[in-house]
Structures are given as C-alpha cells and as structure tokens.
UniProtKB/Swiss-Prot annotation:
Protein family: Belongs to the LpxK family.
PANTHER family reported for this sequence: TETRAACYLDISACCHARIDE 4'-KINASE, TETRAACYLDISACCHARIDE 4'-KINASE, MITOCHONDRIAL-RELATED
Protein's name in the database: Tetraacyldisaccharide 4'-kinase
Function: Transfers the gamma-phosphate of ATP to the 4'-position of a tetraacyldisaccharide 1-phosphate intermediate (termed DS-1-P) to form tetraacyldisaccharide 1,4'-bis-phosphate (lipid IVA).
EC number(s) per entry: 2.7.1.130
Enzyme class: transferase
Domain of life: Bacteria
Residues annotated as binding ATP: N55, A56, G57, G58, T59, G60, K61, T62
A GO molecular function held by the record: tetraacyldisaccharide 4'-kinase activity
Reactions catalysed according to its record: a lipid A disaccharide + ATP = a lipid IVA + ADP + H(+)
Length: 337
C-alpha cells in the first residue's frame, strides 16, 4: 500500500487530514516513547551498529547496511547483520543462506544482504545477536532496529531520503514518522541523508541546522558499473520498493528509454503470473524487463534469468564523521586500502 500524499506535504503547510489525525499520532508517539525507554534486554560483548530511520518505509537503509558491511570488511572486522526479516515466515534465529532460502522464508532484504556477509534473521533481536556472537561475529549491524530496545546500541545511524525528508513532520497516521523528529535525533549518533544535490538542498531548506544538530553525513545511490550498457536500452521497469520513482529516475539518468513503468507495493510478492504478464508487456514493446536489485531476489527462480536488475551502491560525499565513529568503536582495527 502506497503512503498517502498528505504525509509528504511541507511541514508548514499541513492539510486537514494531518490535523484531524494528530491526536492518533500523539498516541502512536507516546507508545514509541514508552517502548524505546525500556532498558535493553541484552548487551552483546561486541559493538552494535544500528541502521534505522525515523520515517516509516524506504529511506535507503539496505544500501547503507551494504556499505557498512564493505567498510567493516575492509577494516578486517567480521560484521554480522541481524535483521527482523520483514516479509519472511521464519522466526529464527537462522543464518541466511541464499542457496537454500528464498524471500518468502527470510525476507528480501536479508537475502540481498547475505550476498555481502553473514546475515541472521531473528524476530528476537537479542537471540539473533547471541547467535551471531556464537558464530564468531566481531560486530553486529542491526538492520532497522532504531525503535527496538532489545539490544544495547553503540552507534545509531538514522537514514533519511533527502528529497522527502521527514515529510510533514507528523507521526503515523498523521504523517510518515515513527516518532517526533527531535526525539528521534536526540537518540541518534549520526544522520545520513541520501539523494542528489538538489534533494540535499531541499532537505537543508526544510530541516536545516535548527533541527539537525548531530553529525550529518550526505550520500547518493549510484549505479554499480557492471559492464552493462544501459544507454539506449528500451525497458519496461517495475519496482516494489519504498519509492519506486527513484528507481525509474535512475534508469532514465543512465539513458534507458522507459516504455512503461510499474510501481508496486513495497515488498510485494512477485509471483510467476505477475512476472509473466510483465515479460509479455515488455516483449510486445520490444523492450527488456528491468527491476531493482532488491526486487530481483523475490523473482521466481524459473524467470529470474529473463529480468535485468540495476544494482546501486551508496557513495558518501564525506565520510569523516563515520570514520571517526568507527575508529572509536574499533581502535585496534587495521584499515585495508
């Protein structure tokens, strides 16, 4: 289900829907405040780095976790991801194995993350952390755990889509937030806004220094150079992510000729019937069917080879604040160039 449009109105231009739902938003915010105030049930003997958000929905957490997996690996640190496994049926803790698990079992995000390093699915994050420690983890990357009090966190990084920012600044259902901005940022150590320069400028205009007083990282999602020539490719594109239009825009930036686009719900199941229909649509237009890297792991195995995916990676404009935070957490780690 797509979020309502009024969630992303400017914070100084609230409509009647946001105002009418504000009392329910206050109840939601109070429930979140009570939850995050609980003392952690488990403090692992290794550093815990949390990647989360204040907004509901997609903000770029998965590419951020992938980037941290690669950064920590370059320091010689065995980092294990612990994820709830949204969309999967396994409660865990279970180590994700792309050779035997599918997205219906463990969720699409853990399945993708497992390609970059050890990844655990666990409804009980503390149990997942214990399993990771027992398997030799030297650090835990807690995926989407910012409002989860189960684990004590050593570093919390909040990720925001720079174009959308914090939406209208109101809490669900009056807006897109899981908790008020000021309250959430007060618990965070780093803020990462993801988007091109124009989006970063928009974020600054709406949420500038008066709101953001913690170290602020900026980054953008850039297509991974795989040797694939995208320019001039006729494509029918589909995406079941938080903001499908961002993916379609990225394809156009690569010179792809979009014959049709199909925005799907976030994490929407991709059954053979749907993909066969999209493949037929692409064939009728003399085009190639294209999707995101995250959607690709949900494709039926028998049709996966007929769909192209465009992988993207997070590129940080300035990683000084992140490097300093990691140096503090891992003072004895050796950076490898």
């Amino acid at each position: 289900m797509r979020p309502p449009g009024f969630w992303h109105a400017p914070p100084d231009a609230l409509g009647w829907r946001a105002r009418a739902l504000a009392p329910l938003g206050a109840l939601y915010a109070a429930a979140t405040a009570r939850r995050v105030a609980r003392p952690p049930a488990h403090r692992p003997g290794i550093p815990v780095i949390c990647v989360g958000n204040i907004n509901a929905g997609g903000t770029g957490k998965t590419p951020t976790v992938i980037a941290l997996q690669m950064i920590l690996a370059a320091r010689g640190i065995a980092a294990h991801v612990v994820s709830r496994g949204y969309g999967g049926r396994l409660e865990g803790p279970v180590a994700v194995d792309p050779r035997r698990h599918d997205a219906a079992e463990v969720g699409d995000e853990p399945l993708l993350l497992a390609a970059f390093g050890p990844t655990w699915v666990a409804r009980d994050r503390a149990a997942g952390a214990r399993a990771a420690e027992g398997a030799g983890a030297q650090a835990i990357l807690l995926d989407d755990g910012f409002q989860n009090p189960t684990l004590a966190k050593d570093l919390s990084l909040v990720v925001v889509d720079a174009q959308r920012g914090f939406g209208n600044g109101r809490v669900i259902p009056a807006g897109p937030l899981r908790e008020p901005v000021a309250r959430g940022l007060a618990r965070a150590d780093l803020l990462l806004t993801i988007g091109p320069p124009a989006a970063q400028a928009r974020f600054d205009a709406l949420w500038g220094p008066a709101t953001v007083t913690l170290p602020h990282l900026r980054g953008a999602l850039t297509p991974l150079q795989t040797g694939m020539r995208w320019e001039g490719l006729r494509a029918v594109a589909f995406a079941g992510i938080g903001h499908p239009q961002k993916f379609f825009d990225t394809l156009q930036d690569q010179g792809v000729i979009l014959c049709a686009t199909h925005p799907l719900d976030d994490h929407q199941p991709l059954d053979a019937r749907l993909i066969t229909r999209l493949l037929a649509d692409a064939k009728a237009q003399g085009a190639q069917l294209v999707t995101t890297e995250k959607d690709a792991v949900r494709l039926p195995a028998e049709l996966r080879g007929q769909v192209l995916s465009l992988p993207v990676r997070l590129a940080l404009a300035d990683d000084t604040a992140l490097t300093a935070a990691l140096d503090t957490l891992f003072p004895n780690a050796t950076r490898r160039l």
